[in-house]
Design a protein with these regions (language model features):
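NAD(P)H-binding glycine-rich loop region in Rossmannoid oxidoreductase-like domains
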Residues: 235-273
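Catalytic helix-loop patch of NAD(P)-dependent Rossmann-fold dehydrogenases
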Residues: 268-277, 287, 300-329
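Ligand-binding loop in jelly-roll beta-barrel domains
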Residues: 118, 126-145
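Non-catalytic, conserved peripheral segments adjacent to functional cores
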Residues: 2-116, 136-138, 147-153, 157-196
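N-terminal Rossmann NAD(P)H-binding glycine-rich loop of SDR-like oxidoreductase domains
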Residues: 196-218
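Adenosine-cofactor binding site in Rossmann-like domains, unifying the SAM/SAH pocket
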Residues: 219-240
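SDR active-site strand-loop-helix element
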Residues: 202, 225, 249-253, 292-297
């Protein structure tokens, strides 16, 4: 069943307050944008991170802005589930937009639709198939994305005319311009579900890594890597994995030979694994918007306090191993 939002074409685009609303698709958010107009035209803040995050929008990290200009009324594109988040809006004109959730899980197949004019934008999470149909000539459809376009990016698709999704297009699909590629997309029953981003456990051959593997088990969304497969101290770590396909990194890797860390060779290895590696992972997580789980140790304190240590206590490491872990913290 399709849910259609009530936005008549004659509604004024002016005078709205910034507002973020949930929809029938989890994570798909509809946003009202304040538009300011006068005799010269109008102005809007199409994306303003501080205000919109405070209003409830995810703090996404856009890296590319695309614009699709459409000459004619009825131009119809979709449905494409892309491997990144999107922030869609229009700079001119108006569209009817529809989405189908293709993410693996209980919301697969959920549908939502609305009209987008210059006073409305929509946040589209990764794995939700996107489409639109122009309702005015010379419509400029614009969108921010959280990853750079690549010919190797993995998409999933569903047909615009799918009977299960039953999208109520304002202009019948047999009367509009659709590419042959879009006409050939599969029905929902044959669409490929988009799997969740993966969790990467680093240091899987170590004591902690083995324990995590025994606890978590083997799943499609879990990946385990040891030093032979992924050297976190390498300056090439940033390009060592398609990091946008991950959600979380659990760093279970560590140089834990406390006595050997006091030797010349051990100091080098301890600093590389414990400090440089952790710093490299932090850079990766910051660059790609990932969650990084870092494991500390009580060795970062000297043990002289008479009470239990807290996370905000001043670091006071004694040996090399402790110093490298404190540097990582």
């Amino acid at each position: 069943m399709t849910f259609v939002a009530d936005l008549p074409a004659s509604a004024s685009v002016f005078g709205k307050s910034l507002a973020v609303r949930e929809t029938t698709i989890p994570g798909l958010l509809e946003v009202d944008l304040p538009v300011h107009g006068d005799t010269r035209g109008w102005f809007k803040e199409n994306w303003q991170r501080e205000k919109m995050v405070a209003a409830g929008l995810p703090d996404f990290h856009a890296v590319q802005n695309n614009i699709s200009f459409n000459d004619a009324v009825g131009t119809t594109r979709g449905l494409h589930a892309e491997p990144w988040d999107k922030w869609v809006s229009v700079a001119t004109g108006r569209v009817f937009a529809a989405w189908v959730d293709l993410r693996e899980g209980p919301s697969f197949g959920a549908v939502y639709s609305t009209e987008i004019d210059v006073s409305r934008a929509v946040f589209v999470p990764r794995g939700v198939a996107n489409s639109y149909q122009t309702l005015e000539a010379d419509t400029a459809y614009t969108y921010l994305v959280t990853d750079h376009w690549s010919p190797d990016a993995a998409y999933s698709f569903v047909n615009l005319a799918d009977e299960t999704a039953a999208i109520e297009w304002p202009i019948p699909l047999d009367q509009v311009e659709i590419s042959e590629k879009d006409r050939a997309h599969p029905r929902l029953a044959d669409a490929v579900p988009v799997k969740p981003r993966r969790i990467l456990v680093i240091g899987s051959s170590g004591q902690l890594g083995r324990a995590l593997r025994a606890s978590y088990g083997e799943h499609d969304h879990l990946e385990y890597a040891d030093r032979d497969e992924l050297d976190i101290s390498s300056p090439e770590l940033m390009s060592a994995r398609p990091w946008r396909t991950y959600d979380t990194i659990i760093n279970a890797a560590a140089y834990t030979a406390v006595d050997r860390a006091e030797t010349v060779e051990g100091r080098v290895d301890a600093w590389a694994a414990n400090a440089t590696g952790a710093a490299n992972l932090a850079r990766v997580a910051a660059e790609f918007g990932l969650t990084l789980v870092h494991i500390s140790t009580d060795y970062v304190f000297d043990g002289e306090l008479e009470r239990a240590y807290r996370e905000d206590d001043a670091l006071c490491p004694l040996g090399v191993y402790a110093q490298t872990k404190a540097a990582a913290d």
